[in-house]
Amino acid sequence: MSNLRLRLLSLVSILYCIAALRCRPDQTETIKRFKNEFAFSSICRNDTNFFSGVVCDNTTGAVTVLELPGGCLRGTLRPNSSLFELSHLRYLNLSFNNFDSSPLSSAFGQLNNLEVLLLSSNGFTGQVPSSIRNLTKLTQLNLPHNKLTGDLPSLVQNLTKLLALDLSYNQFSGTIPSSFFTMPFLSYLDLSENHLTGSFEISNSSSKLENLNLGNNHFETEIIDPVLRLVNLRYLSLSFLNTSHPIDLSIFSPLQSLTHLDLHGNSLTLTSVYSDIDFPKNMEILLLSGCNISEFPRFLKSLKKLWYLDLSSNRIKGNVPDWIWSLPLLVSLDLSNNSFTGFNGSLDHVLANSSVQVLDIALNSFKGSFPNPPVSIINLSAWNNSFTGDIPLSVCNRTSLDVLDLSYNNFTGSIPPCMGNFTIVNLRKNKLEGNIPDEFYSGALTQTLDVGYNQLTGELPRSLLNCSFIRFLSVDHNRINDSFPLWLKALPNLKVLTLRSNSFHGPMSPPDDQSSLAFPKLQILEISHNRFTGSLPTNYFANWSVKSLKMYDEERLYMGDYSSDRFVYEDTLDLQYKGLYMEQGKVLTFYSAIDFSGNKLEGEIPESIGLLKTLIALNLSNNSFTGHIPMSFANVTELESLDLSGNKLSGEIPQELGRLSYLAYIDVSDNQLTGKIPQGTQIIGQPKSSFEGNSGLCGLPLEESCLREDAPSTQEPEEEEEEILEWRAAAIGYGPGVLFGLAIGHVVALYKPGWFIKNNGQNRLRGIRHP
């Protein structure tokens, strides 16, 4: 692949080098007309940003390069688009724009000077037009991640200069044309993630193919034999072939240039796995995940150039052999989701001298003490095992260690004092004791600290204020005795704070009782089942970021998503949602929740709750709140789950709650509410238990009928109505994101949180990432 990359990079460099800064007026006008055909994201509305991807020839002034930033264009790409008037284009990249399920236009065939055409992730539908054959100068054609259908086109018939062809992640069907393997210069071919079937023929070994990906198709017959004739292959992916016969690993011995082999999701013959077979000695990356292997493969011992090995999701049991740590170049090793119980060799030295930097041994049955980790370790995941004893202090000497996940084990003793050295620390669900070390140094890089479900005592360490990058802090289900950590609002990036089931106590409002809580970025605050007391000021929620969250405020889709090389980590947390308390993973970045339940809070629910426009879940149950349910709840338009049960609330339920279209769960039981239950569709569908324990309530879903069915709501006096209007006016002034919040509600309504139980392991996306 390196030669191919160099050639393509050289082409782009040449195109830019021969370009002038100025284009002919008619070309500039054509580009502007093309721009005006689409809706734009804010980053692309500026002409300077848009034209930064336009390059013109220094002699003719014609546009030769058009490379638009991903996500700028949104709309239909029509056959008469101004784009197709740019007949001198040599390089066109429109990837990652949204063309709204447009068909791939035959007008692309008019751009017959194109050498590079990149149309990845555009939403194109239908078949590839035959006019693509007119682009005889193409060296690279990328059409992946679209919705293209039909048989694989014979478009390559005239494209004799192609170096790279990527048709992956589409809906192509039928067989692979043999002409794909006779192209004189084709070095890269990716047909993965389609619906291809049947077999294909390769007449000779003259093909220049070095990179071939046929994974995740529906081949029903043998396709490996013809592939073995491609003797120049360096990269080969045959994952999830769905063939009826197991694969014999020894058949790959003719491919001596092979450095990368992906067979995950296939069945392998037992003899080839457990024998000293002849295997390509230049192998660097070998992916055998989910291959039904039950013993550690012996042939791996001879692969001295191997640097990435994936044996995850197999049935391997017993001890990890000590020779695996002696492979001189091994950097990434994934043994997760097997049945390993231990390690051969001394725990002090067996791993310590290894070159491994990324190690995943999660979801196994390891027991006993934890071995000293490799000296160069960067990412270490050992969650969901049965390790016991102390966490080895040697982790503090691993200066490269970035991610440490030892959660769901049986570790005892204290937390090592070096947690501020790491980006991710997850020690959840162990038996750790003592205080959380107060040794987070200035400039600590910690982003996630999860020590929930242990036996920790003392106070929250004030040195956490040095962790300016921290996003996720969870100390739930411990024995921490402290006041409400209002001082944490000085952390500029804190998004999730979980204090559930400890001995936190005292008031939650600031000392002057006037200021708002004002965490700058907090989205999830879970402080239930503590001993908090006092009341909340009216403006308590006035300055929270939850009021204006947008769906794509960040690049990450999931909260706490951390990726490094081949390692993926996502934060998980326990939340009560729609009446269920479960562990939640894959939390979308715009998800927001507040849980104050099970405390001793009193007074009225602050009217400022109505400012939290994008709040999705709110639980204030089992406190001593009094007064009316604020009518400002009607402004929390994204609310899906509301629990106010077990308080002393009085008056009527605001009829406006019946118009909250996403409210799928409401519980106001065991209060002192009166009057008619709102009759919105969402509320009528609730069980009657959600309204029981209020002697004055009537109407569906309760059996008590109301005497005056048409009586309007009169719970709020005129002065309070004026106050609510003031809150609504304040909400308008609190940010332009309010209207956009209504739009993302449609996505929120479809979003189902990733509920799962930890022991189910396979749903938790942690471990070494497939290339």
Curated annotation (Swiss-Prot):
Q: Which GO terms describe its cellular component?
A: plasma membrane
Q: Which Pfam families match?
A: LRR_1, LRR_8
Cytoplasmic topological intervals: 751-771
According to its UniProt record, where is this protein located?
Cell membrane
**Annotated TM spans:** 730-750
Look up and give the membrane topology term. Answer: Single-pass type I membrane protein
Q: Which residues lie on this side of the membrane: Extracellular?
A: 21-729
As given in the record, the signal peptide range reads: 1-20
Q: Where are the LRR repeats?
A: 86-110, 112-135, 136-159, 160-183, 185-206, 207-230, 232-254, 255-281, 283-303, 304-327, 329-350, 353-377, 378-397, 398-419, 420-443, 445-467, 469-491, 492-516, 519-543, 588-612, 613-636, 637-660, 662-685
**Chief location of this protein?**
membrane
Highest taxon, organism lineage: Eukaryota
Glycosylated residues, per the record, are 46, 58, 80, 93, 134, 158, 204, 242, 292, 337, 344, 353, 379, 384, 397, 410, 421, 466, 481, 543, 619, 622, 635
Keyword list, A-Z:
Cell membrane, Glycoprotein, Leucine-rich repeat, Membrane, Receptor, Repeat, Signal, Transmembrane, Transmembrane helix
What protein family does this chain belong to?
Belongs to the RLP family.
**UniProt xrefs under PANTHER family:** LEUCINE-RICH REPEAT RECEPTOR PROTEIN KINASE EMS1-LIKE-RELATED, RECEPTOR LIKE PROTEIN 30-LIKE
- Know the name of this protein? Receptor like protein 22
Supply the gene name.
RLP22
